Amino acid sequence: MKVLWAALLVTFLAGCQAKVEQPVEPETEPELRQQAEGQSGQPWELALGRFWDYLRWVQTLSEQVQEELLSPQVTQELTTLMDETMKELKAYKSELEEQLSPVAEETRARLSKELQAAQARLGADMEDVRSRLVQYRSEVQAMLGQSTEELRARLASHLRKLRKRLLRDADDLQKRLAVYQAGAREGAERGVSAIRERLGPLVEQGRVRAATVGSLASQPLQERAQALGERLRARMEEMGSRTRDRLDEVKEQVAEVRAKLEEQAQQISLQAEAFQARLKSWFEPLVEDMQRQWAGLVEKVQAAVGASTAPVPIDNH
């Protein structure tokens, strides 16, 4: 860091002699930078501030910066600062996730998804900064001995745009983390409230029991015996009431069973009568026919017997 601050100081003193014209910063960037470098001083915000300071130094495109851009030193420094920022951000996110345990699973998943998206955007834009510098180094080396004013102007424009994107990413990430932290605080308060609701009745019961034991200890033996007798009597009455209720339930069930049996018996009787009527309708014609045949047979037999018993006439000569 001492080397970094020394480089910044040298850049500031030599700014007037730089070959490249310094880019004009928008008026709103100081406020955004203040937000990006962290109002609460979280480790990830401090790490992002170090990345930010290094980017501002690179953005000056002073002679020293141009010399170092021809070597991989700048990109290595940016890589280190990027890794440090993302590491601190992941650690802070893990800490908030532990505090979010009492929150509903759906809410926790939604907040985690939004935070991961904001974190990914910040990482992608930081990676874009490094890629632009690598591309610039390659183009400068390819144009060795030629004018690189156009390349430097293009790089300065790209860095300004990327800087604005990084500011927006940092601001969005701070807002997401604030929502995440608020959810963790709300979940913790809800968990404490739930514990208080569970323990409240138990504490009240303990207090009542303690008061009862204290009052019983101060009463004479006769009063305690009388109170015990009343409690036993109340208990017996309660048991008797429960028994009567149970008997009433059994009676109702027996009555229901009896009604069902009577209904089934009536149905069986009706079915038997219907079956009897059906049998009668089947066999009645047959019986009548047999009776007719029998009557005819009897008449024939009687006629035959009458004919055989008639007197034979005697011939007198």
Swiss-Prot record:
Residue ranges for the region (8 X 22 AA approximate tandem repeats) are 80-255
Pfam families hit by this protein: Apolipoprotein (PF01442)
Q: Where is this region: Homooligomerization?
A: 266-317
- Positions bearing Methionine sulfoxide: M143
Segments carrying the region annotation (LDL and other lipoprotein receptors binding) are 158-168
Question: What segment(s) does the record annotate as region Lipid-binding and lipoprotein association?
Answer: 210-290
UniProt GO BP:
acylglycerol homeostasis; cholesterol efflux; cholesterol metabolic process; chylomicron remnant clearance; high-density lipoprotein particle assembly; intermediate-density lipoprotein particle clearance; lipoprotein biosynthetic process; melanosome organization
Q: Cite the post-translational modification comment.
A: APOE exists as multiple glycosylated and sialylated glycoforms within cells and in plasma. The extent of glycosylation and sialylation are tissue and context specific. Glycated in plasma VLDL.
What is the superkingdom listed in this entry's lineage? Eukaryota
GO CC aspect terms? chylomicron; extracellular exosome; extracellular matrix; extracellular space; high-density lipoprotein particle; intermediate-density lipoprotein particle; low-density lipoprotein particle; multivesicular body, internal vesicle
Q: Which UniProt keywords apply?
A: Chylomicron, Endosome, Extracellular matrix, Glycoprotein, HDL, Heparin-binding, Lipid transport, Lipid-binding, Oxidation, Phosphoprotein, Repeat, Secreted, Signal, Transport, VLDL
> What Gene3D superfamilies does the annotation carry?
Apolipoprotein (1.20.120.20)
Q: Region (Specificity for association with VLDL) spans which residues?
A: 278-290
Write out the GO MF terms.
amyloid-beta binding; cholesterol transfer activity; heparan sulfate proteoglycan binding; heparin binding; identical protein binding; low-density lipoprotein particle receptor binding; phosphatidylcholine-sterol O-acyltransferase activator activity; phospholipid binding
Q: What is its main location?
A: secreted
Q: Where is the signal peptide?
A: 1-18
Which regions does the record annotate with the repeat sequence? 80-101, 102-123, 124-145, 146-167, 168-189, 190-211, 212-233, 234-255
Residues reported in the UniProt entry to bind heparin? L162, R163, K164, R165, G229, E230, R231, L232, R233, A234, R235, M236
Keyword Glycoprotein set for record: yes
Please state where this protein is localized.
Secreted; Secreted, Extracellular space; Secreted, Extracellular space, Extracellular matrix; Extracellular vesicle
Residue numbers of Phosphoserine PTMs? S147
Tagged with keyword Lipoprotein: no
UniProt-listed InterPro entries: ApoA_E, Apolipoprotein_A1/A4/E
Q: What does this protein do?
A: APOE is an apolipoprotein, a protein associating with lipid particles, that mainly functions in lipoprotein-mediated lipid transport between organs via the plasma and interstitial fluids. APOE is a core component of plasma lipoproteins and is involved in their production, conversion and clearance. Apolipoproteins are amphipathic molecules that interact both with lipids of the lipoprotein particle core and the aqueous environment of the plasma.
Assembly description: Homotetramer. May interact with ABCA1; functionally associated with ABCA1 in the biogenesis of HDLs. May interact with APP/A4 amyloid-beta peptide; the interaction is extremely stable in vitro but its physiological significance is unclear. May interact with MAPT. May interact with MAP2. In the cerebrospinal fluid, interacts with secreted SORL1. Interacts with PMEL; this allows the loading of PMEL luminal fragment on ILVs to induce fibril nucleation.
Stated name of the protein: Apolipoprotein E
Organism, by scientific name, is: Macaca fascicularis (Crab-eating macaque)
